[in-house]
Structures are given as structure tokens and as C-alpha cells.
A protein has these predicted regions:
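Beta-propeller folds
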Residues: 12, 19-455
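Sec-dependent N-terminal signal peptides
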Residues: 4-14
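Short, Lys/Arg-enriched, disordered terminal segments
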Residues: 1-5, 19-20
Length: 455
């Protein structure tokens, strides 16, 4: 009996050696920690007058709290449903301002405790800087007075930063257009508790489609409801004194962009139906231009759901795309349309056409240029100067053209024709400056353009 009791005691002691120790996260020795957890040099943003620099600081690595946050994946988005901002944001933890002729930087005062800063944006006259701060419950809007280096909170934690830029400056430098959570916002559906709102229906109509394997797609009716919920906002005009005015009622706002002169606002909204096989950038959308008071001027684009695409890397959708304000004009839109039905297999003389459309959009758009390859981008200069790039994946060819945007009959001049993978032939990037509208345009001096490259 004594032998049996001794055996049981030995067994218990032996098993206890294998029990899980109650360990917490440990830190390595100081010598190792100093190598890994070093303080990063700040990033720098300077005003165009070269008077002030903004220095931004961030952690070398994300914190465990950042990595452990709740995440919801819908329609290609990864967001934190509690704070209503992307779950992949890397936050800034400190801000300093330095006057160029000063020896030392000034710590920005009034910052929130434990700052989690993102979405920095200079005002048009560069006297203020707006930023968002993420709390445990949501996103707040703050503003910094550059001259005094003092930060002030403008809103509660009700900014919706789930999709696109959460705010944009008005031209008056005193007001900010802000996406906010609707006051009557419903609670998100919980897949573990709430029954599906409807069946999952897949249609197989025999159409051919070259789709990639996308991540984080919508899967059911509950996902659809939650997706609509998280991207729905109300647009508010928020004065820097804290006063707020409803600008536009609730909708699924994807993007807001003021014209260079500040008199017009281009707003893009996501529309229905949603898709289970492509992400939100291929969902239906509508683009409307309003005046600065919020009065509708013109619906300038409507894009249907496009789940089916032609084969090839140079395939694109039909209709207006790449719609943006022209940086060197007060209020002119530029956009691109495919001349080959978006299908690289179609043999045509020109692949794309670039058009211009002047506000208030009473007249029809005018053609500016047709490209032989797929449109790759444009850099505006002035009335007679712009740079256009086209490209073709199959041949790896990219061409850069010097054009006169005011004369469609003047032949574009090819200034670079090269293989995009040949880095030795890369002439560099065109130097740009900010113009009277605060927009980036080509730096032109004595009719010369300048490029900066690795050499």
C-alpha cells in the first residue's frame, strides 16, 4: 500500500513538470532589444513656401494591441468594425514642427494621449494640418495650427475612415468635408448569432471570364448588409472652430475631390448590386459633381457592375474611367475611354482616347488625344504642355509623349520609347511643383522640363 502511494506521488510530481507554465510575453536582453527596437528617423513633409517642416514619428514595429484588433473582411476591405478604420493602418505616434531657419524642432502640443495618428492633410494655404486619431472606440478629427504647433480636437470619435480619404479641405482653409457615421446607424450583423438574411445564389450563365482569385469577397446576404453598413456615411462640413453642418445625406461614399479652384466637388458613390466574385472596385458606381454649397451640377459618370473582363493584362472596362480634375485648370475633368472595347485581342489603330470636359458640363466633352497603347497616366503642365504615358504589357513597351492639350491636331512627340523592365534606360521622373491651385504640375523653366532619376 505504501509502495502504491509512493508511486502515485511520484507520478503526480512527474506530471507537474509537464504542466503549462504561466508565462507572459518576454523581452530579450537590452543588447538584442537595442538592435531590433530602434527609434526610426522621422518622415518629413514640407510646405511649398519652404517655411515649415512636419516631422512624423512611428514605432519600428506594430504593437501587440494593433495585431490583436478585431478585423472584418468584406468586399476587398479589411477594417476594424469597432473603430471604423482599416485594420492595416500603420499609425504615427508623434508630431513635431520645425521652422526651416530654426535650429530645433517644436513638439506639437495638445496631442491626444497615446496618439494613433493617420490621414495627415495640409490645408490649401498650408497654415493648418488636419489628421485623424484612432481611439479605442472610433476615429476623431484633429487640426494643427502650424505657426503655433498646437493641436485641437474638432469631432468626437464618429469619423468613418473605412473607405477612401475620410476628409478633404474646402478651399476657404476654414472648413473640412468629413465622412461621419450616420446618426441612425444600425448594428452590424453577427454571423455567429444572426440568421442569414437570404440564401446564397450563384448564377452560371456560361459566360467566359478571366477573373483573378480575389481575397476578402462578400459571401452572403449578411456580408452584403454589413458591407453597406460600414461604408455608408453622412458628409459634414466641419469648421475649424468645431461647428458642424450636414452637407450631404447618408450614402455609400467612395471618394470626394474638390476642383482645383474649389468651386466644384466630384463625389463617387458605390451602387448596387454587389458581387460575390469581384471586389468593390468593380462594383457599380456613380460620379456626380456638386457646387461647393452641395447643389447638384451634373452626373458625369455611371459605371455598371463588371464581373466579366476580356482576357489579358491590358484588358479594361468600357465607358469612362480614370476621371480626374485637370490640375492646371480651374474646373476641367479629364477621362479615358477604351476604343477597343477593352479587349487586347481586338486589332485597332488606337487603344484609348483621352477627353476633356469643362465645368459646368453643359457642352459635350472634347477629344484631346488617342493612344496607340493602353493609357498609363498624365502629368499636366500648362495650357500648351502635358506629358502622357501609354504602355503594353505583352511587349513591355512604354512610351512617353509631349503633347499640347489645347490642340488635338498637333501630333504628340515621343520623348521616350523603351522597355519598361530596362531600368538602365529609365530617364527618371518629371519634376513637379505646386501651382496657384495647390496642385502638382510640371516644373517648366524657359520651355524646359526636368527629370530626376537614379542615373
Amino acid at each position: 500500500m505504501k509502495l502504491k502511494a509512493s508511486f502515485i506521488l511520484f507520478l503526480c510530481l512527474g506530471l507537474s513538470a509537464f504542466a503549462q507554465e504561466n508565462l507572459t510575453y518576454q523581452k530579450p536582453s537590452k543588447s538584442i532589444l537595442d538592435l531590433a527596437d530602434f527609434e526610426r528617423a522621422p518622415s518629413v513633409s514640407m510646405d511649398t513656401k519652404k517655411e515649415y517642416m512636419l516631422l512624423t514619428y512611428r514605432n519600428t514595429y506594430k504593437t501587440l494591441d494593433d495585431l490583436n484588433q478585431e478585423e472584418m473582411r468584406l468586399g476587398g476591405l479589411r477594417i476594424n468594425p469597432v473603430t471604423n478604420i482599416s485594420s492595416t493602418v500603420t499609425y504615427i505616434n508623434n508630431l513635431k514642427i520645425r521652422k526651416i531657419n530654426a535650429k530645433n524642432e517644436t513638439q506639437v502640443s495638445g496631442l491626444p494621449e497615446n496618439p494613433r495618428i493617420s490621414n495627415l492633410s495640409w490645408s490649401p494655404n498650408e497654415t493648418k494640418i488636419a489628421f485623424s486619431h484612432t481611439t479605442a472606440t472610433g476615429v476623431e478629427l484633429w487640426v494643427i495650427d502650424v505657426a503655433t504647433a498646437k493641436a485641437t480636437k474638432l469631432t468626437a470619435a464618429n469619423v468613418n475612415a473605412n473607405l477612401g480619404n475620410p476628409f478633404s479641405w474646402f478651399k476657404d482653409n476654414e472648413s473640412i468635408l468629413v465622412k461621419m457615421l450616420p446618426k441612425n446607424r444600425a448594428a452590424l450583423l453577427d454571423a455567429k448569432k444572426d440568421l442569414p438574411l437570404g440564401p446564397i445564389i450563384s448564377n452560371a450563365d456560361g459566360s467566359k471570364s478571366q477573373n483573378r482569385t480575389y481575397q476578402d469577397l462578400l459571401k452572403n446576404k449578411n456580408d452584403e448588409a454589413n458591407f453597406e453598413n460600414i461604408i455608408t456615411s453622412e458628409l459634414y462640413k466641419v469648421n475649424i472652430n468645431g461647428a458642424t453642418t450636414l452637407f450631404k445625406s447618408a450614402d455609400m461614399y467612395a471618394g470626394e475631390d474638390f476642383s482645383p479652384d474649389g468651386n466644384y466637388l466630384m463625389v463617387t458613390t458605390i451602387e448596387k448590386p454587389f458581387s460575390y466574385i469581384v471586389p468593390l472596385n468593380r462594383f457599380p458606381s456613380k460620379t456626380v459633381v456638386y457646387d461647393k454649397e452641395g447643389k447638384m451640377v451634373k452626373t458625369v459618370n455611371e459605371v455598371p457592375l463588371f464581373e466579366i473582363m476580356p482576357k489579358g493584362f491590358m484588358a479594361t472596362r468600357t465607358g469612362k474611367r480614370s476621371m480626374n480634375w485637370r490640375n492646371d485648370k480651374p474646373a476641367t475633368l479629364s477621362f479615358v475611354e477604351a476604343l477597343d472595347q477593352g479587349d487586347p485581342a481586338n486589332k485597332v489603330d488606337f487603344r484609348d482616347e483621352i477627353s476633356l470636359w469643362n465645368a459646368p458640363f453643359d457642352a459635350a466633352p472634347t477629344s484631346m488625344m488617342k493612344t496607340k497603347q493602353r493609357y498609363g497616366g498624365i502629368i499636366w503642365g500648362n495650357e500648351t504642355t502635358a506629358i502622357v504615358v501609354d504602355q503594353w504589357y505583352d511587349t513591355r513597351n512604354t512610351k512617353t509623349y509631349l503633347i499640347n492639350p489645347s490642340d488635338a491636331n498637333q501630333a504628340p512627340k515621343v520623348i521616350s520609347d523603351r522597355n519598361s523592365q530596362d531600368i538602365y534606360s529609365d530617364p527618371g521622373n518629371f519634376e513637379t511643383i505646386k501651382n496657384q491651385y495647390g496642385k502638382r504640375v510640371l516644373a517648366i523653366e524657359n520651355n524646359n522640363l526636368f527629370l530626376i532619376g537614379a542615373g
